[in-house]
């Protein structure tokens, strides 16, 4: 979050696994209700609906503007970032990203999607927020990470941005991106989770929760039987080859 004159600039990474800002990170998922749910710790209320933020896992969609979910998750991300400085009303400029090869084709629609309401009010964590969205800029994912020092790169460099839903690869030659050598593949870490889940089900006729699989992928262990852990670790190694 940066302040420029009377505007707050907030960078948001709309990941398939996690929503991220400079100071916050939370799972990309939500559940919508028509009335207030029993548990309200991560409750966002917007446009007459109740959303539990961070619940479930949003399934992969190639166009993030196709439904309401990423808009609501954006509101939550802004609120979480503003809450670090106890701000509840502000002029906001959103800086967001899209996968490399999708940026040109989708940036106009995604920008309009995030700008759909220039004035927006909602409640998050029982706190009211009032925002004026002044503008949106869309940038290519991955490249943004090295942009500040790209001119210092020499020779051939390969930038790999491996996310939950996609993997972006960009070739750089003497600090300049090669437009003809950039790729976006639907092969992120969640595909590994799905492969492990399917293999486990085939071998045991039981379903293993994604959270347990992800814990094993991150730490190499989980509170499950040793035989189950062995299946997960074996499939993890197979997929990772």
Residue ranges and their predicted role:
Residues 162-168, 237:
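Ser/Thr-glycine-rich phosphate-binding loops at phosphate-binding pockets of nucleotides
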Residues 1-159, 174-191, 203, 210-241:
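Nucleotide/phosphate-binding catalytic cleft detector across ATP-hydrolyzing
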Residues 194, 198-201:
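Long, charge-rich alpha-helical interaction segments
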Residues 171:
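A short helix-loop
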